[in-house]
Amino acid sequence: MMRLALTTSLLCLLTGVLSAQQLQLPTANHALFDAPADFFQFVDRNFDGAKTTPWEGGQFGFVRDPRRIGSRIAYARFHEGLDIKPLQRDAKGNPQDEVGAIADGVVVYAAASSGLSNYGRYIVVRHDWGGSPYFSLYAHLAASRVSAGQKVQAGTTLGILGYTGSGIDQRRAHVHVELNLFLSSRFEAWHAANFSTPNHHGVYNGLNLIGLDLQALYLAQKKKPSLTAANAVKATESGYRVAVPGDAEMEILKNYPWLLEGTHPAGKPASWEVTFSPWGLPLAVKASTTAVTAPFLTWVKDAGIPHYTHTRGCVTGSGSTGKLTADGLRFVKLACGWF
C-alpha cells in the first residue's frame, strides 16, 4: 500500500510539473492556431521598391530585413519573440487588451520607465520548471499592473497592451512576448566592460536573456501537451559550435544541467564545446580534452548564404568555413561566462 501511495504521489507530482509547463497565450487573441494573419502584428516593409505590411514579420525567427543574395531572398534580421496584435481598441484607437502571464511564476522585473529600452515598458516573469529557471518577457506595454516579487498564476493580468518603445506607432500596437533562458548573473560586469552606455535593467536586460522558439513550442504543445521547454530547446536546429576554455564559468550548465552531453568532469575540463542555434540559443555543452586559450568557432552550418546573415552577425565567412566576429566573441563570452 505504501508503494502504491508513493507511486500515486509521484504521478501527481509529475502531472503537476507537466501541466505547469502547458503555456497559455498572453491575450484573448488565440488566432495563432488557425488564422496567423489575425494573430501576428504586421511590420512596415520597403523592399525592391514595394511598400508592404506583411504579418509574417511579427513571427519568431529570421523574418525581417529581406535582401537579395544571388537568386534567393534572405532575411537577415532576427525577431526573438511573437508580436501579438490587439483585439480591442477604444474610440481613440488605443488598444485595451489585457496581457496575462503565460504560466505560473514570480515577477522579477517591471520596468519603471517606458523610455529606457527598445522594449518600452516591459515585465519579466520567472518560471521554475524541472529545476531550471525560464523567463517570459512582455514588452511595449501601455501600463503595468504588477511589481517585482509578486507571485502570479497563468492568466494573471500583468499589464495593458500598448506601443511603448522605439519604432512602434499606434497602428502597430502589440505585445511582444518571449520565453528565455538566462545567461549570466554577472551580466552587469560584462555590460560595463563592453558598453559605455548605462545598463538600466540589471540582469534582466534583454541582452542577458536568450529566447527559445516560443511560436514552435505553442504549436507543438497544441499537438502534444506534455512537451516541455527543455524538450523544445533540445529539438532546436544547430547553427554553430564553439570551443571555450575549460575555466569558463558555464553558468548555463548550472541552470540547465540537461544541456550537458556525456559525463560531467570531476574538475575543470581542458575545454568546453558549446552548440548554439543560429540565433545563439545554447543547445548542448560537452567537455573536451583539447585545451584552448580563447573561444573559437569549430563548426558552422552551411545555409547557402553568408554566415553573417543567419547567425545574427556572430559568425563571418561562408560555406563550411567561418570565424567568430567581434560581436560573436563578445556574446560567447557572456553565454559561457568567460570574462
What is each of the regions a protein language model found here?
Residues 1-3:
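N-terminal secretory signal peptides that target proteins for export/translocation
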Residues 21-121, 163, 200-339:
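Surface-exposed, glycine-biased beta-strand/turn segments
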Residues 94-96, 100-143, 170-172, 176:
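Zn2+-dependent peptidoglycan hydrolase active-site motif and core
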Residues 102, 146-147, 152:
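Surface-exposed strand-loop junctions at beta-sheet edges and helix termini
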Residues 88-90, 131, 142-145, 183:
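Residues that cap or initiate secondary-structure elements
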